[in-house]
């Protein structure tokens, strides 16, 4: 069986809890992307910090191993759809938290028009109505790979898979109204 790994926090909290500018910025992001709480935002901010930290370290590094790690970092960000193919390490340093949050499953379900609101997108995901390439994903914070983006659909067993479902008809009417 072995010893299980120790569970660690996957995020860093802000160093000072009451900075008004940061609180205002976080509140806007939580509302825009319908995050459950600030912890979800801090997890993605920590991810972004780690990408940027690695890029700064690799910009200063020389050698064969540094070249390999540069290519791996850029390839990872390109697979996630955060950066375009052929990007440079300087592009990693200019990433913002919005670039990460735009790749969440919750955001992409809303943008594809599978839900009326971003909050409804979260509910559909948590309730198991959304699948990615045939696999039901119940985590709204799942970062969708670029190649998986076209595979986001309603689940086969979901009532939403039926095109005559009343809620789907409402969603389609809303989309038609926005298109006009």
Swiss-Prot record:
SMART domains: Ribosomal_S4, S4. One of its GO terms (molecular function) is rRNA binding. PROSITE patterns: RIBOSOMAL_S4, S4. Residues 103-174 form the S4 RNA-binding domain. GO terms for cellular component: small ribosomal subunit. Transmembrane segments: none annotated. The keyword RNA-binding applies. SUPFAM superfamilies: Alpha-L RNA-binding motif. One of its GO terms (biological process) is translation. Coiled coil: none annotated. Keywords: Ribonucleoprotein, Ribosomal protein, RNA-binding, rRNA-binding. InterPro entries: Ribosomal_uS4 (IPR022801), Ribosomal_uS4_arc (IPR022802), Ribosomal_uS4_CS (IPR018079), Ribosomal_uS4_euk/arc (IPR005710), Ribosomal_uS4_N (IPR001912), S4_RNA-bd (IPR002942), S4_RNA-bd_sf (IPR036986). The keyword Ribonucleoprotein applies. One of the primary rRNA binding proteins, it binds directly to 16S rRNA where it nucleates assembly of the body of the 30S subunit. Part of the 30S ribosomal subunit. Contacts protein S5. The interaction surface between S4 and S5 is involved in control of translational fidelity. HAMAP family: Ribosomal_uS4_A. Belongs to the universal ribosomal protein uS4 family. This is Small ribosomal subunit protein uS4. It comes from Thermococcus sibiricus (strain DSM 12597 / MM 739).
């Amino acid at each position: 069986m072995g010893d299980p790994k120790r569970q660690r926090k996957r995020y860093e909290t802000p160093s000072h809890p009451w900075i008004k500018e940061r609180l205002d910025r976080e509140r806007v992001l939580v509302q825009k992307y319908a995050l459950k709480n600030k912890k979800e935002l801090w997890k993605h901010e920590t991810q972004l910090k780690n990408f940027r930290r690695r890029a700064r370290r690799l910009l200063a590094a020389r050698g064969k191993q540094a070249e390999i790690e540069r290519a791996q970092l850029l390839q990872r960000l390109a697979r996630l759809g955060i950066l375009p193919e052929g990007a440079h390490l300087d592009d990693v340093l200019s990433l913002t938290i919005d670039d990460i949050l735009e790749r969440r499953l919750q955001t992409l379900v809303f943008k594809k028009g599978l839900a009326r609101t971003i909050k409804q997108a979260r509910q559909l995901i948590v309730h198991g109505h959304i699948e990615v390439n045939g696999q039901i994903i119940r985590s709204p914070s799942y970062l969708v790979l670029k190649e998986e983006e076209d595979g986001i659909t309603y689940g086969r067993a979901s009532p939403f898979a039926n095109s005559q479902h009343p809620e789907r008809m409402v969603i389609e009417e809303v989309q038609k109204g926005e298109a006009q």
